[in-house]
Each structure stands twice: as structure tokens, then as C-alpha cells.
Design a protein with these regions (language model features):
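Non-catalytic, solvent-exposed segments at the cell envelope interface
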Residues: 2-7, 14-30, 36-595, 603-607
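Acidic, glycine-rich low-complexity segments
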Residues: 599
Length: 608
């Protein structure tokens, strides 16, 4: 939710481009031509070939915008956008000619013509308006002095860019939404062209949205108006808690006018004497009294809450009781897991631990979530995590330029979407900006953008989370006249531990027999509902309908032996206000891939 390469056509280096398959539209339109006789049919066919040629050339010119990969040559990119505009304008003019407008009224297959018209219109609007706005922001930032030296980010250019990038992002998101609400094509080849275009547009929109969101929160987070102090809560998803995993240690992050500093990390053992994080009655009933593992609600278990706001409130309550925190105002919390740290090392550089092992952008997560428990004594584990966190987070904004800033911004956005990174500020104004930008993980709350929430907490004290793989499939069933949609969801958890591995692993990793015992909470979308909830495989307790801090949740415990799987299946109805596809918000795993696949072929939102 992207930047494109541009130069005069003769200077574009030969390389492979991802091109929307406009060529397939020609054959698809032949079906429509069967209903248009003689000369007019041939004319429509000829014009369709012209549309194909224009759009192929435009997409080739815009090939770099989708990956923000050519920030060193923004002038070249801008030239390509200008050339692409000529192509998309021509395609759009042809596709909205009199003959096309008549053909769009044809029975059955007229919608396919309308879809092609809509595709050309959206792409032309993007190239004419949204993309140039975005490129202007990048050009301004590229010419600015972003680094103030000594690891400090100059925040003034970011502050000045906030409004413009938000405007460009809003325009782009509106065009993508318009594209996604085009009539559902009936001809297979048109469907394929539409799907390929949707993939390209969504990729672009995701990246711009991530960048825009990060720009909105960075200045305040980095202390543009006053110094800030945050608790950096290090989670291990090998021992799952709803929001991530058991908190192994807590560091102190201070920010001041663009400079970020990492203070001492303290193990959870140093925090335990200072009590629990003030759980609500609902939280005590579900997470402590029910069991089988009774949560203590001390610092180790603060991620058991699926809402970051509750984890933050619990952290502040404990912080204020400690000798090191009682006289220091805590402005907020940052919750990070090893996947976030791994992705940061790709940007900030490798980390070498004391024994010479080099942690990179490929092996850091596996090391911190599994190998450290296999190969290192318990006494060293927290210190190794702290070293990686201190180096990776501490250098996020050092030696910054536009390319690095863009990478960090996109990373923060994508990691927040997957719950590998979350933050919360106690200042209400600051938190509203953070939450609106998508950086505060929370249970489903938007009727317009529906989500199902699935959150798991390990009930077998162990590090089995590394071996529990979760996959899901979301299939749209119907699109109602009232604006709601129905979906069928299959959510599967598999214990990938093999019996042959058990003998080589300690009880510290395996707990009781290498079982996964997953307390599973399932939330319906805001304003929607869940029905026909069933389970198969493993051993699952009957789902209890509970209330957790004002929201209905379906709760159960699933026991999964090595090699076994448990599947939850249920139907979902969204709010009538829904404008986007149903997604799944879930407890993060030890890798980037969420395991979610979506099939929306049945119908289009707001269309039959």
C-alpha cells in the first residue's frame, strides 16, 4: 500500500518488468464482439488493441513505483510518470468512447466492458494526481538535510511533509478502493487482468500507506517538542501471549528531538517483585481463574491482553512501583518481537554476539526464538536478546537519508500490521495519532474495515510457539444488498514438532510432552457476528462465549500433540458499513508470513 523508475524511453535499461496482462483483454473482448456486428465490431476490436498497447507501455514506465526502489533517481522517475500519463490518458479516452459506452450496456458481458473502463480510469487518475503528489513529497525530502549528525534525525522536514503525504495517501487509497469496487468480471481473462492490476495497486497503496502513517507518528515519538521515555518490552513468541509472547526483559528508550537512546535492559526477574499490572475482572476470570495455566499478570504476562493499551497500562502500574521508575514519567511503551529485530538488522546492519555468532536479516528471529534455547544457558538468553535490541533499535535513525528513512518507515508500518511491533502513548492526543496510523494493536474495532481477531496464549509453560504453525483461509460467500458480506473462515494450528526431535530437546523447550496447549480467543468483526463455530482435530474444549473488557469473545483451549492439527471453522457476517475485504488480526508468529489466504471471487463489495 510505491515508486517508479522513469527516463526517456530510449534510456530505460532492459530489465524484466511486471506488466498488467492487458493483452488478455483483447481475447476477452471478442466475446462481447459477438454481439456487435460488422464494422463496429472490427472498430471496437481495433480500439481494444490500442488500449492494450497504451496500458502496457504505461505499466512498464511505472514499474519502479511499486517498490520505492529508485530513490536515488527521482528525476528519472518523474520523467517516466509524465510519459506514463500520456499513455494512460490515451487509453482512458479510447475506453470511454461512444462505441465502448454502448457496448457497456450489453446484457451479461457489458459489465466486463465497464470493468475495463474503470481500470483505465483509475490508472489514469493515479498517474495524473495521486502519484505526482507522492513524488513531490519524496523530492522535497530528498533535497532536505535529514541527518543532524550523532545518530539524530532532523525532524523539521518530516513535520513539513506530514500534511502533503497524508493528502497523497488519501487520494491513492480512494482510487484503489474505487478499483476494488468495480463490477465483478464474468470473462476469465478479464478477471485475470483485473486481479493482476489489483495486486499491483494494493502493493503500491500498502507501501504509501505505511510511509504516510509512520510520518504522522515519528516527530512526536522522537521527542520533537519534549524528551520522551518509553518501556521497550521484548516479547518471545516462542511462548505465545495474545499480543505476542512472554516478556523476557524490558529496556528503557529515551527520545529527544530526533535522537533515540537505549538504556539498560532489566530481566523480567527484576520486575517480578513489584507486582502485577492491575487486571480487570474479565481478565482475571479468563486468563487466571480458568486456566489451565494461571496467568500471574506480572511483567512476564503483560502481553496476554490482546489490546496494547492494556499491556501499556499494566506496564506503567508496575513501572511506578520500581526504584528506577518511581521518579521517571513513562510516556508510553514499545512492544517488539524477534521478527521486528531481524528486519531492522537488514537496514541497520548485522549484530555479532560475544561468541562470534553473526545475527543477520535472515537468521535473527530463529536464533532468538529457538536456537538460543537449544544452545545457550538460561542465564545468557535475556542478555543476548537485549544486545540485539539495543543495537538494532538504537541505530534505526543513525546516518539517515531518504532511502533509509523510507525503509524504516515501511518496516514500522508492515511490522505493526503483523503485530511484530506495537506502541502506545499515554498522552491522549499523541495516542490518537498513533492509533489512527495503525501502530497500536487492538482487537477488532472498525466496521468499515472488518477483521476477525484470533489470539492465542500458550498454556504449556514451554517454548513450543516456534513449532506451532498457524494458517487460515478466508472465503467470501455473499455480498448483501445492505452492504454486509458473509465469509467462511478456516483457522488451522499445526504442531510441527516431530517425535524424532523430542529426545534431543529439554523440558525447558518442550514443557509437558511437546504439546501445544493454546488458549484461543476469537473475536467477530466490529458490528458483525460469528456463527456455526466448529472444531476438528486435536482436543478442544467447548467454546465459551465470554465478555472481555466490553467485547464478546469465543474462548476455548486446544491441545495439539506433535504432528497433530486443530482447525476452527466458522462463518462471519460483517457490518453493513464494511467497505473492504475481511482480514484476520492474530497473535504474531516467528516469521513474517501470516499464513492467511483470501478468496473473494464470489462477489464484489456492494455488488451482486
Amino acid at each position: 500500500m510505491s515508486v517508479h523508475r522513469a527516463s526517456h524511453a530510449t534510456s530505460i535499461p532492459r530489465r524484466r518488468h511486471r506488466i498488467w496482462p492487458w493483452a488478455v483483454l483483447i481475447l476477452a473482448l471478442l466475446v462481447v464482439l459477438l454481439g456487435v456486428s460488422g464494422f463496429f465490431g472490427l472498430k471496437l476490436y481495433s480500439e481494444a488493441k490500442q488500449v492494450k498497447a497504451h496500458e502496457e507501455q504505461a505499466m512498464q514506465l511505472l514499474g519502479g513505483v511499486t517498490d520505492l526502489g529508485n530513490l536515488d533517481n527521482l528525476d528519472t522517475v518523474s520523467q517516466q510518470i509524465s510519459q506514463a500519463k500520456t499513455e494512460t490518458s490515451a487509453a482512458n479516452e479510447i475506453a470511454h468512447g461512444t462505441l465502448w459506452n454502448i457496448a457497456s450496456k450489453a446484457p451479461v458481458y457489458g459489465d466486463d466492458i465497464t470493468t475495463v473502463q474503470g481500470m483505465t480510469s483509475v490508472v489514469d487518475s493515479l498517474v495524473s494526481d495521486s502519484v505526482p503528489q507522492f513524488m513531490n513529497v519524496l523530492s522535497t525530502l530528498k533535497s532536505a538535510q535529514l541527518s543532524s549528525g550523532d545518530g539524530q534525525l532532523n525532524l523539521q522536514p518530516i513535520l513539513e511533509a506530514q500534511k502533503n503525504i497524508a493528502t497523497a495517501n488519501q487520494s491513492l487509497q480512494q482510487q484503489v478502493q474505487k478499483y476494488q469496487q468495480l463490477p465483478k468480471a464474468r470473462i476469465g481473462m478479464v478477471k485475470n487482468a483485473y486481479a493482476a492490476g489489483n495486486t499491483q495497486l494494493t502493493k503500491m497503496a500498502d507501501k504509501v500507506n505505511q510511509l504516510s502513517g509512520t510520518f504522522q507518528i515519528l516527530p512526536d515519538f522522537l521527542g520533537s517538542d519534549q524528551p520522551r521515555t518509553y518501556a521497550l518490552m521484548a516479547m518471545t513468541t516462542s511462548e505465545e501471549r495474545s499480543s505476542g509472547g512472554l516478556i523476557g526483559s524490558v529496556g528503557v528508550v529515551t527520545t529527544d528531538n530526533g535522537k533515540i537512546s537505549i538504556g539498560d535492559f532489566r530481566s523480567n526477574g527484576e520486575y517480578i517483585p513489584y507486582g502485577a499490572g492491575d487486571p480487570t475482572e474479565d481478565e482475571q476470570r479468563i486468563f487466571q481463574q480458568w486456566g489451565p495455566l494461571n496467568m500471574s499478570f506480572d511483567v512476564r504476562d503483560l502481553a496476554v491482553y490482546p489490546d496494547t493499551s492494556r499491556s501499556a497500562e499494566g506496564m506503567r502500574a508496575i513501572w511506578q512501583r520500581t526504584p528506577w521508575g518511581s521518579n521517571t514519567q513513562l510516556d508510553g511503551v514499545l512492544m517488539v518481537d524477534p521478527v521486528f529485530l531481524q528486519e531492522l538488522t537488514k537496514i541497520s546492519g548485522n549484530v555479532t554476539i560475544p561468541d562470534g555468532t553473526v545475527l543477520t536479516g535472515d537468521n535473527t528471529a530463529e536464533f532468538l526464538l529457538n536456537k538460543v534455547y537449544v544452545d545457550y544457558p538460561v542465564s545468557m538468553q535475556d542478555a543476548l536478546f537485549a544486545q540485539v535490541a539495543e543495537q538494532a533499535v538504537g541505530s534505526m535513525f543513525s546516518n539517515i537519508d531518504l532511502a533509509k528513512l523510507t525503509k524504516v518507515a515501511q518496516l514500522m508500518g508492515s511490522m505493526a500490521e503483523g503485530r511484530h511491533f506495537s506502541m502506545y502513548a499515554f498522552d491522549e492526543t499523541a495516542e490518537k495519532t498513533i492509533s489512527d496510523a495503525g501502530f497500536t494493536a487492538q482487537t477488532p474495532s472498525s466496521e468499515e474495515h472488518p477483521q476477525v481477531g484470533v489470539y492465542v496464549t500458550e498454556q504449556n509453560p514451554s517454548k513450543m510457539g516456534w513449532y506451532i504453525h498457524r494458517t487460515s483461509k478466508v472465503t467470501r460467500s455473499t455480498c448483501g444488498n445492505d452492504g454486509s458480506q458473509t465469509y467462511h473462515v478456516e483457522y488451522k494450528m499445526t504442531n510441527t514438532l516431530e517425535n524424532s526431535q523430542i529426545g534431543a530437546l529439554t523440558s525447558y523447550i518442550l514443557g509437558s510432552g511437546g504439546q501445544g496447549v493454546e488458549k484461543t480467543l476469537i473475536y467477530a468483526p466490529a458490528g458483525g457476528s460469528i456463527s456455526n463455530l466448529k472444531t476438528s482435530g486435536g482436543s478442544v474444549t467447548e467454546s465459551r462465549q465470554e465478555t472481555l473488557n466490553g467485547k464478546t469473545v469465543y474462548a476455548s483451549n486446544a491441545t495439539i500433540a506433535p504432528g497433530e492439527s486443530v482447525t476452527y471453522s466458522f462463518d462471519v457476517t460483517t457490518s453493513t458499513k464494511a467497505v473492504s475485504d475481511l482480514t484476520i488480526d492474530q497473535t504474531p508468529m516467528g516469521w513474517i508470513d501470516s499464513g492467511v489466504t483470501t478468496d473473494t471471487a464470489a462477489c464484489s463489495i456492494n455488488k451482486q
